[in-house]
Structures are given as C-alpha cells and as structure tokens.
Amino acid sequence: PWGDKMDRNYVWYGGNSGHTHHPVGTRKPNPWGLYDMLGGVWEWVSDWYGEFYYKNSPINNPKGPSNILSWHVIRGGSWIDDKQFVRTTIRYPGLADNTDDYWVGFRCARDLN
C-alpha cells in the first residue's frame, strides 16, 4: 500500500521489529482495512509449491498433490527478514508437516459470498 518505498507504519520486519514478534494489529491497516498483510510472520497459504504450479493449475480451487509431505507456499515475509523479502508476491516452499518455525504462522480467511 505504500508504493516503491516501504512505510514502516504498516509492517514489522527486520529493520524495525527489534528481532521479535509483535501482537497483531499494532501497525496500521492497509487501504482495505486488513492488518499485518506483510511482515509479522510468514503465512502458510493453501497454494501448493511447485516450479510450474500457477502455470499448470486450474484458476479456481486447485487441488494440489495428494501427498501430505508436498510443499506448501509461505508468503509475506516476517519480523526477521530484510525489507526486500517483505512483499505479497514473494513465496517460498515449506513442508506441510514442519510447523516448528517461530517466524511462520497462518491467517484464517473466509469467502465473503
């Protein structure tokens, strides 16, 4: 929401976090009223990670592989990362059974329809 220059009022990252996590909602919301869309913790999303995942998957409700040990995507960067890693378009793989990283979390979401 801040253009080409990061506005520290909206995000926790390695440059302003004091190298620790912070309560949700302590930064300003984005223009859509959503808090902590970047920084804070990396967030698990339901997308599966693969080199060609977006190219080869259906647009609506892709199922992903049936293997529980398949890679999922984490997004958004965290309070330990440099600012170049704190953006919505960045994605990294994470194993679905590896949940012990204290800089990775998840976001609850629901369909508005």
Question: Language-model features: where?
Answer:
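Short, structured beta-strand segments at or near domain termini in extracellular proteins/domains
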Residues: 100-113
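Functional-site microenvironments in short loops/helix caps that host divalent-cation chemistry
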Residues: 1-91, 99-102
